[in-house]
């Protein structure tokens, strides 16, 4: 326990909390325009072609974000909505693109976890 004198000389410093998604600037989502849509490979031990997009946000940030789900209709100049959330096996990917919002369609024929992929409720047969 420090003495009062020690605290006067060197006060307590509170820890600075660093944001995990700085480009959002404390907003829940941000809109942006795709500048490049491509696939990339995950780090070991996984193997796949993960779909990602480079997005220029309305606040000027340029970020790499992940396109979840099977199949997508994104291309250059598509307007998308991004949210926070990293992809553990893709270094540098700290954002997700929201499915079923703006130019990105929801996942077709999705039956479970539909809200996460922007899929409408299927018609009862």
From Swiss-Prot:
The modification 3-methylthioaspartic acid is found at residue 89. It comes from the Bacteria. GO terms for cellular component: small ribosomal subunit. Keywords: Methylation, Ribonucleoprotein, Ribosomal protein, RNA-binding, rRNA-binding, tRNA-binding. InterPro entries: NA-bd_OB-fold (IPR012340), Ribosomal_uS12 (IPR006032), Ribosomal_uS12_bac (IPR005679). One of its GO terms (biological process) is translation. GO terms for molecular function: rRNA binding; structural constituent of ribosome; tRNA binding. The keyword rRNA-binding applies. Belongs to the universal ribosomal protein uS12 family. Part of the 30S ribosomal subunit. Contacts proteins S8 and S17. May interact with IF1 in the 30S initiation complex. PANTHER family: 30S RIBOSOMAL PROTEIN S12 FAMILY MEMBER. With S4 and S5 plays an important role in translational accuracy. Interacts with and stabilizes bases of the 16S rRNA that are involved in tRNA selection in the A site and with the mRNA backbone. Located at the interface of the 30S and 50S subunits, it traverses the body of the 30S subunit contacting proteins on the other side and probably holding the rRNA structure together. The combined cluster of proteins S8, S12 and S17 appears to hold together the shoulder and platform of the 30S subunit. This is Small ribosomal subunit protein uS12. It comes from Cupriavidus pinatubonensis (strain JMP 134 / LMG 1197). The gene is rpsL.
């Amino acid at each position: 326990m420090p003495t009062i004198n020690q605290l006067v000389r060197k006060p307590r410093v509170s820890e600075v909390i660093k944001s995990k998604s700085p480009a959002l600037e404390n907003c829940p989502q941000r809109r942006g325009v795709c500048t490049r849509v491509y696939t990339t490979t995950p780090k070991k031990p996984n193997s796949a072609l993960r779909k990602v997009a480079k997005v220029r946000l309305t606040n000027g940030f340029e970020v790499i974000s992940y396109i979840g789900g099977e199949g997508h209709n994104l291309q250059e100049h598509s307007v998308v909505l991004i949210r926070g959330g990293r992809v553990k096996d893709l270094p540098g990917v700290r954002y997700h693109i929201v499915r079923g919002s703006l130019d990105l369609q929801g996942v077709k024929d999705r039956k479970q976890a539909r809200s996460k992929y922007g899929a409408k409720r299927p018609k009862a047969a």
